[in-house]
From Swiss-Prot:
Its main location: periplasm. This is Chaperone protein Skp. GO terms for molecular function: unfolded protein binding. Keywords: Chaperone, Periplasm, Signal. Homotrimer. Residues 97-108 are annotated as: Lipopolysaccharide binding. It comes from the Bacteria. InterPro entries: Chaperone_Skp (IPR005632), Skp_dom_sf (IPR024930). Residues 1-20 form the signal peptide. GO terms for cellular component: periplasmic space. It is found in: Periplasm. Molecular chaperone that interacts specifically with outer membrane proteins, thus maintaining the solubility of early folding intermediates during passage through the periplasm. Belongs to the Skp family.
Amino acid sequence: MKKWLLAAGLGLAMVTSAQAADKIAIVNMGNLFQQVAQKTGVSNTLENEFKGRAAELQKMETDLQSKMQRLQSMKAGSDRTKLEKDVMSQRQTFAQKAQAFEKDRARRSNEERNKLVTRIQTAVKKVANDQSIDLVVDANTVAYNSSDVKDITADVLKQVK
């Protein structure tokens, strides 16, 4: 009787694990993120958003470099002292604006990245629910997967569109 119960329990465990394996899928999040970012034009949006400020910084840098070259060729005098103060002030202003620019650009980039991640996660959940999948794992974190594991990357990409 004990052997029969043990065999029945083992058989039930194998059936349960086989059913669980059918409900696992993988998705390539890196690939999805890259493709969705290209399709939505996030990089172009960010580039256009910061184009004016980047041009202003480039102009300031060019102007500062020309003043520094003039300063190097000048001899000591009141004009040189005035130009030195102007260059120091402009260098400080440039550094502050450049730092603010980088900070704003990084913040906006993170905002857009988070929006994309949210869209992708929502699509993954929808595809998983539609296909009765219990567990979805990022393909990049899996050391090995058999050919039995379903890859839903293409389905998720269609859903995100």
